Every structure is written in structure tokens, then in C-alpha cells.
Amino acid sequence: MRSAQVYRWQIPMDAGVVLRDRRLKTRDGLYVCLRDGEREGWGEISPLPGFSQETWEEAQTALLTWVNDWLQGSEGLPEMPSVAFGASCALAELTGVLPEAADYRAAPLCTGDPDDLVLRLADMPGEKIAKVKVGLYEAVRDGMVVNLLLEAIPDLHLRLDANRAWTPLKAQQFAKYVNPDYRARIAFLEEPCKTRDDSRAFARETGIAIAWDESLREADFTFEAEEGVRAVVIKPTLTGSLDKVREQVAAAHALGLTAVISSSIESSLGLTQLARIAAWLTPGTLPGLDTLHLMQAQQVRPWPGNALPCLKRDELERLL
């Protein structure tokens, strides 16, 4: 016998969270909980403002329609990426497809203070990997900060994310301030330039490896082995169903590319599922999930070891 609940929620964010020039004061989303007999499965639907095509309200309408269809016996999935992902996660839990084992390591997000990063990395098992957002300030400053971190911590590898912020000139200004001897320890730089061609040229000219992120969601993108391209960053909330995520991971691995499962600032419930997806589909690759510290609370399922308060399901607003 099938049954379902849908919950709507809103989590206050820390004051300094800015996405594409917009301050994110709250993270808004939905949960779906599906039941079939004794089995239960949860999924999170939280479109990311400025990145997702769909709004929270559109996702809510699509989710409620899909849940009602599912209760009538339908087996399809919604079209909207965030709704497709959340619904497919709930189904994967319900049917036991999504393994329980999780990779709760997360590449720490670094603000540029090497002393702070040294402390955070000290507790990190395995290879020392951190992530730095670049492109928010002057390219020269970014280059100096990255160089300082790599110089201060000799076994550190950095993942950098520019979100297509730079012109070719700005990208070159950044590279100029990174010692060529340290560049091999830049694991990859996500989307340095506004166009893929400019990003490819940057990789060839500087020897700094790049990764595709936004490009994966563009209609003309195809997976291919290219000089200077080392990785793809997959954000399931922006990608779509679990099957689509699996297809992208498989396509990347077939070309020898690293596939990194990455957060779209989901709640703790969604992040714990992404940690399970990472352990399942990209074992051995550190996922990019260090975003819970941007929030003021956890919900339903806490992240292991995190001290933030965790709201229970009966504290959420129920829609269905």
C-alpha cells in the first residue's frame, strides 16, 4: 500500500552567503517521504536560486503532481532536475538501490587563512584537499592567496572554482601569481573563463588543469577527452534523476576523468544522501559537500559529528 508525505521548509543562512551577486538569506526546499508497506524513502527537492531553471514554487507544484501520480501507481519521474533528483532518491531508498555506506569526508572550503586551513586539514584522513572560491575579488589577489596556501602546506592539493568569472586576461593575471612549481598541486580549476574555448586555452597556456561544471548542463555539451581537462563536477540537484547522475559519472570515468559529486547547498538530509551517492558512484574521490556550515540548523537527518541543532520531521510544515 503506497502512501506519501510532502514537507516544506526554510532554513536561515549565515549572513555572508552570496550566490551570483544575490544574498541568500534562507535556503528553501521540500522533502518527499514515500512509503510502500514497511519500506520508506526520503528525497530532498531544493532548487538553487540563480542556478536552477525552476523556482521553489514551480518545484512544489511539480512534486505534488508527481506524488499524486505515484500514489495511483505511476512509475515515471518528473522533468524538472531538482524534482527528478529528489523523487529518484526517495524511490532509491524505498527500493534499497541507494546503499547506506557514505563518504562523510568533505573538501573543506577555505577562505584564504592558511593557519585555519592547517587546523582543519589536521583531522582529515588521507590526502589533503581543500577548495577555494576564486573570481570574487581581484584575480591578482586570488593568485597570491592560492600561492600562499600551496607554499605554506607542502602536501596540499587545491580545487578552485571560478564560476566563469574571468576574462582571458584576468585568468592570466591569476596564473602569473601562482608559482609554476606549485601548479601541479592545483587538482583542477572549475570553469575559469566565460566560454569553454577560453577555458581550454587557459589550461593549455598555463598547465593548470580545469574542470567542467556549468558546462555539463548546457545543451551542446558532450563528454570527450581534451587536453588540460581533468575533472567534471556533478551537482545532482541541478542535473536531474539519479540515473542521469550515474550516466554522467560513467561517461567521465570512461574517459579517465575524475567525477566529483558536489553540493548545491542542500540541507543536512540532502547532504547525507549525496555522501552516500559519492561513496557508491565515485569511491575514493573526495566529494564537494562542505556547505552545512553556511546554515543555522540541520533537519531530519544530521551530518555525523556536526553540532548544529537538528529539527525533526514533526517540526516541518506538512503539505501532504
From Swiss-Prot:
Molecular function via GO: magnesium ion binding; O-succinylbenzoate synthase activity
Name recorded for this polypeptide: o-succinylbenzoate synthase
Organism: Salmonella typhi
Binding site residues for Mg(2+): D161, E190, D213
Protein's job: Converts 2-succinyl-6-hydroxy-2,4-cyclohexadiene-1-carboxylate (SHCHC) to 2-succinylbenzoate (OSB).
Keyword Coiled coil: no
Pathway note: Quinol/quinone metabolism; 1,4-dihydroxy-2-naphthoate biosynthesis; 1,4-dihydroxy-2-naphthoate from chorismate: step 4/7; Quinol/quinone metabolism; menaquinone biosynthesis
UniProt KW Transferase keyword: no
Enzyme category, top tier: lyase
Family per record: Belongs to the mandelate racemase/muconate lactonizing enzyme family. MenC type 1 subfamily.
NCBIfam families with a match to the protein in the record: menC_gam_Gplu (TIGR01927), PRK05105.1 (NF003473)
Annotated EC: 4.2.1.113
GO BP annotations listed: menaquinone biosynthetic process
Catalysis: reaction(s): (1R,6R)-6-hydroxy-2-succinyl-cyclohexa-2,4-diene-1-carboxylate = 2-succinylbenzoate + H2O
InterPro entries tied to this protein: Enolase-like_C_sf, Enolase-like_N, Enolase_C-like, Mandelate_racemase_C, OSB_synthase_MenC1, OSBS_N
UniProt lineage: Bacteria, Pseudomonadati, Pseudomonadota, Gammaproteobacteria, Enterobacterales
Names of the cofactor(s): a divalent metal cation
Keywords of this entry: Lyase, Magnesium, Menaquinone biosynthesis, Metal-binding
Annotated active site: K133 (proton donor), K235 (proton acceptor)
